[in-house]
Amino acid sequence: MLGLNHTSVSEFILVGFSAFPHLQLMLFLLFLLMYLFTLLGNLLIMVTVWSERSLHTPMYLFLCTLSVSEILYTVAIIPRMLADLLSTQRSIAFLACASQIFFSFSFGFTHSFLLTVMGYDRYVAICHPLRYNVLMSPRGCACLVGCSWAGGSVMGMVVTSAIFQLTFCGSHEIQHFLCHVPPLLKLACGNNVPAVAPGVGLVCITALLGCFLFILLSYAFIVADILKIPSAEGRNKAFSTCASHLTVVVVHYGFASVIYLKPKGPQSLEGDTLMGITYTVLTPFLSPIIFSLRNKELKVAMKKTSFTKLFPQNC
């Protein structure tokens, strides 16, 4: 489907966790707990949104879709990572490596696009409240969600097809704990590598920066409108609807900038592994915590839903 270039390399060896030989069991237990918490946290958000009629609004529809993208992103990466921590054979087949890159980039960029859509939703709600029902109609929301998923899939296809059209020769050890673009490019050879490497980086950075700048622009208008509210209580109430989203944006793009905008130069295997862990494990882990703690309406609804499921006879 992606026109992959099957070279003499039939598999790769993931060596990222070899930098921490004495910590692998502890890391396995830690990442397993974080993985389960991420899944359960996002599932609880989804169940709460769908079971509480008061949350059937565009903002919570987007949040529910964001939870789906986070679940799929973690499922695409972490189970394989957990298996490698318990194994001495950390080989990954050529096609499995391509699939991991495709799904991780697809769901990762879908997450970024959905955060952008949520920023636009907050902009419309605060700056154009009288037109909110028109601009954020069910059809319009479905279109925004569909475009986010389609955009993520296109990004995944572009990156995967560009990388796996290259020829891989020499060493087949990936200096990472998952199939990741920069260490894969170091294994590629051929005349087209100098063009593909900056091209892929430019596409990814442009997409991320475009989303980030759109969110910044949305919040610039939001802050300007909030400052016009005369009462402090009104300003706090308006800003509270944005606090959880803004916090997740800072976490998401903060960790993403570490991965994609780090300066060129010699990098240690330990440093690359730790930076990768922050983005692939820690970011999805923090997201449901932030939304459940900083969104008062969602927090109350989650408590109600949890109580109903645990003690149905008392409801």
Predicted regions mapped to residue ranges:
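Transmembrane helical core of 7TM receptor-like proteins
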Residues: M1-C315
